[in-house]
Regions:
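Basic, amphipathic alpha-helical/coil surface patches used to engage anionic, phosphate-bearing ligands
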Residues: 1-192
């Protein structure tokens, strides 16, 4: 994690060096970014400030990502490293927001599952899960709620059945809803 944290520090410093955020340095310094970045273009993975400006939204449109092609280009560990780096970037951004606002800034993670093939290869989900577990250990105060949008019907029924069995600390951070996000611009900063 030290390597990812240092890379994140360097990337954020470069991304903000001219007084406004420039994403290119963050993407260029991402571990395995040369193999991964193209799969996340076009609004498939986005970081946004929330409406209040006191936290971040990290949105993943999983159904729009060609996970089979992505996972043929990288290993689960490489993708997990990439996602962990993204968490380190979010930690740096939340730290700056916290200093500015005087309150703890967190990241709300939004997973849009529209179009996700639950019966396909689990490698992509395994990489997300590995990065999430490591990220929660390295950045314990960073995670805010997790919003799962557009769950496939069967999964939605199972989640409703098993959610009461989750610990209260987990249930407090989960949100489920059906919401058509439309095109990638639906989560742009112009739309709020």
């Amino acid at each position: 994690i030290a390597r990812d944290s240092q890379a994140a520090r360097d990337a954020v410093a470069e991304a903000t060096s001219e007084g406004a955020w420039t994403n290119r340095p963050v993407q260029e310094k991402a571990p395995h970014g040369s193999k991964i970045n193209a799969f996340f273009e076009g609004g498939r993975v986005m970081n946004l400030r929330n409406k209040k400006g006191d936290g971040l939204i990290y949105a993943i449109r999983a159904g729009d990502i060609d996970d089979k092609a992505l996972m043929s280009a990288v290993t689960v560990e490489e993708l997990a490293d990439f996602f962990l780096y993204a968490k380190a970037i979010n930690e740096r951004a939340c730290s700056a927001i916290s200093k500015k606002t005087g309150t703890l800034a967190t990241v709300t993670t939004v997973n849009d599952l529209a179009g996700v093939d639950l019966l396909g290869d689990a490698s992509f989900r395994n990489a997300l899960s590995a990065a999430s577990k490591r990220g929660d250990a390295y950045f314990p105060g960073l995670s805010g709620p997790t919003v799962l949008l557009n769950l496939p019907r069967l999964l939605g029924a199972l989640v409703k059945l098993f959610t009461p069995l989750f610990p209260e600390s987990v249930r407090a951070k989960l949100r489920f809803d059906r919401f058509p996000l439309g095109d990638a611009g639906a989560l742009s900063t112009e739309s709020g």
